[in-house]
Amino acid sequence: MRKLLWLFGFLPLFLQAQVEQARVHVEKLCSPAFHGRGYVNNGDAIAADYIAEQFKAVGCSSFSSGFFQSFEFPVVAFPGKMEVSINGKKLVPGTEFVVDPGSKGGEIANLKVAVVTLEEAFDPKKLKNKIAQVNMDGGGRSKQQLALLFSTWQVKGDSLKQLKKMLRELVTTFPVIEVVNDKFTWSVDQEQTNNPFIQVQYTAIELGESNFITYSIESVVKQHRARNVLAFVPAKKRSKKYLVFTAHYDHLGRMGQEAYFPGGNDNASGVAMLIELARFYKENPTDVNVAFIAFAGEEVGLLGSKYFTENPIFPLENIQFLFNTDIMGSGEDGVTIVNATLFPKQFELLQQINTANKYVVKVGSRGPAANSDHYFFTEKGVPAFFMYTMGPNRHYHDVGDTYENLSFAEFNDLFGLLTKFGAQVSEKAYKRGKKK
């Protein structure tokens, strides 16, 4: 206990260095040289190497298999041309248009566009007539080439869901243009659509009586080899038990060579937290092993963590607690804890620590959800929390999620909350597990 008191008396001095070093990590991981940590230009591989280098520099130990765990999966990538013009105006990728994460590529000039009204969209007969009308040449013959444009931003609720579903069906036959009036939220997909599917900002285009689209889009489906990055700090005395911290490092990558998604808050910030936690525990080992796992493939569907739980490097039953972190670059409005309702005692401990130290304004409770890498561990019986911050930064899965847009306002407090929780939850579990 005396050592714990000394340790956390030292913590405030340690924290300032932590946040400054975290800024360095995030700026690096968000830089164009990392290509959005995705599937173009080996972005995720560059990030994996960087994280492993940081674990080594900190002095962490590797597992018997090394610092990496490899696995494969199919993914849609956009490595080359990404050009779209509507009525002669060239649109800016990432801000004025995005392609659907599973969009097929293609190249065509001056393809006629049928602008579908909402009335036509929700009436199959009128929609069919509209397509037939626009799809005729001057001699009354069908041209068999046409793109469909829908403005979905005027629709809400169930009607919007119905319309979105319709677009998914129509893209099997036609290129589809969806006009939106809110920020883009991009993603990653593993399967291609039959035709190009393009989202365009309402403010970026002007429509007339006759409308045309020109596009050149390179889209490929490839089998991708990714790597989880793993390290640990051994316990002070030999132990089979683990406290585990995790964060995914992959993001969305590039959409062509001009636009990339930096992924500052999601989740370069979580990776920075992971690296700095490794530094802290290397200098302050505990009675249990402390493992650090940076997962790949989270944005594709939690693939890295799923693979790890099916092929564990150490027995999952030896994990006393797992803490998954994401969106660590803000926190002005507090944090939310997924799985809080599954593990009420641990959640109560976390709240007590936060209240006693006045770390963040709120520690919110949320039930189980398959929304990050904690999920498959929980499914295997591992006690786990997933913590993400809340704050004014609304950039998520867009090109504005940059290093410059992060406040790091609560990074120090989040670090303190995590380390104090880690010390107490592992100490209590260790004492319960000791033989008398």
Say what each PLM segment does:
Residues V19-N42, I46, V58, S62-F63, ...:
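N-terminal capping segment at the start of a domain
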Residues P32-N42, A57, Q69-E72, V113-V116, ...:
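Second-shell loop/turn segments in exported
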